[in-house]
Regions:
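Core catalytic region of metal-dependent phosphoesterases/phosphodiesterases
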Residues: 2-88
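Active-site glycine-centered loops adjacent to acidic/histidine catalytic or metal-binding residues
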Residues: 8, 36, 58, 98, ...
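Short, Asp-centered acidic motifs that coordinate Mg2+ and/or phosphate
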Residues: 30, 94, 115-116
């Protein structure tokens, strides 16, 4: 099973559209958004996804009731909002959390309950294997905000190979 992972989109409409196109091309079966959607108007673009999406609330989410209203008004299908997801996907136990508390993120990785931990928040894309756990932070969609920062990116995790890849979504 292929799982799309995106985070910290911060209203970057062109890159959100590009990410959705990539997820559809990759034939992911679900997308996990690790938080910081920011403005609810951007939810309309996720309608083009060919799969369900789960949105984590980040530290820049804004009014959750407004997000729920917009999701419904835009006709977004098969979606869910939450602060934490513990999921069984493709035979793997997956934890998804925004990542704004590094101690919690670290505890999820080290606890032994999960095969995968998806997080965001710090805008630093990385894929790291820690023991049997793969930790995926897809990075952000914002422009490079500091010298030497990784380019804007998303990630795709494959439960069959227990591996992930980062995909550059820079313009």
């Amino acid at each position: 099973m292929k799982i799309g992972v995106i985070s910290d989109t911060h209203d970057q409409i062109a890159r959100v559209k590009k990410a959705i196109d990539i997820f559809n091309q990759e034939k992911v079966e679900i997308v996990i958004h690790c938080g910081d959607i920011v403005s609810p108007f951007t939810l309309q673009f996720y309608k083009k996804l060919n799969c369900p999406i789960k949105f984590l609330l980040g530290n820049n989410t804004g009014d959750i009731l407004l997000h729920l209203k917009y999701a419904k008004n835009f006709g977004l299908r098969d979606y869910e909002f939450g602060t934490f997801f513990s999921l069984n996907l493709g035979g793997k136990k997956v934890a998804a959390y925004h990542g704004d508390n590094e101690e919690i993120t670290g505890a999820l990785i080290k606890c032994g309950d999960y095969d995968c931990v998806f997080s965001g928040h710090n805008h630093i894309s990385r894929i790291e294997k820690i023991g049997k756990v793969i930790s995926v932070n897809p990075g952000r969609l914002l422009d490079n905000y500091k010298e030497g920062a990784n380019p804007p990116s998303i990630a795709v995790y494959d439960s069959n190979t227990h591996d992930a890849k980062l995909i550059n979504v820079a313009d």
